[in-house]
């Protein structure tokens, strides 16, 4: 039996001097111990998800905690049967969370160490979910919400997180005077976004401390009132949260049956994320439209080594065809 892999999810807002130089040092250490993952380092802090065996992840946590800036950094730990990443990336960025505020002439100077929403533990957050007078706002991207979300949470009409501030401004009259609680995967986005909401004048703003990941591991709430699965930005794609009465809410793009398996459209110029069973992925060569299924650079066809005849036969089976190849 192979050894379990641990996946570490973490962040910390803290001032990092010479952050670009520190990012290079961080990458060097990670590679030296064989860690895999993706880490962002900025002047405002660090945000990462990494994976490795027990010994490797323990070495990494000990090394991070040995730096007084990160002595109290909170690692959220999952155990998996296989690696969540294939390579190791550590990148320097201007911010570990980009709200896109400056793009909309918003005040972009948000420091979660100075201004942020009230922390709610899982029990308090569950109580907020059950409170009819509390507005629960999902701050993630649309495709994350579609895979899973808290029951009754608002799905903003946005495609990605950077569009959320404008959406809130456009709809603030609906809940400006109400209690608003926000949530995200691990908490890093909510730290900054809830601070922005406080700056915007919202009187009562809370956030799920530690994010959905912590809620799912809490021994008391056990992820209850979460519907579906949680989207994660690694090879796992999704992880279970509700251990009381789990449900599947997402539906297969092709036949509408319950499905939590996300794939990207095989047309590299489309890349749309869709839910699809392995059977339907093969049947529709992972294309979200007739054009994508017949695209000359269809990645499913390339990855699976389909001959042109085999490709044509699959399309013919669903009433479609490949374009004719001109004779030379």
Curated annotation (Swiss-Prot):
Its EC number is 1.14.-.-. SMART domains: RHOD. CDD domains: RHOD_YceA (cd01518). Keywords: Oxidoreductase, tRNA processing. It catalyses: uridine(34) in tRNA + AH2 + O2 = 5-hydroxyuridine(34) in tRNA + A + H2O. The keyword Acetylation does not apply. This is tRNA uridine(34) hydroxylase. HAMAP family: TrhO. Residues 130-224 form the Rhodanese domain. The lineage of its organism: Bacteria, Bacillati, Bacillota, Bacilli, Lactobacillales. Belongs to the TrhO family. Pfam families: Rhodanese, Rhodanese_C, UPF0176_N. The active site is at 184 (cysteine persulfide intermediate).
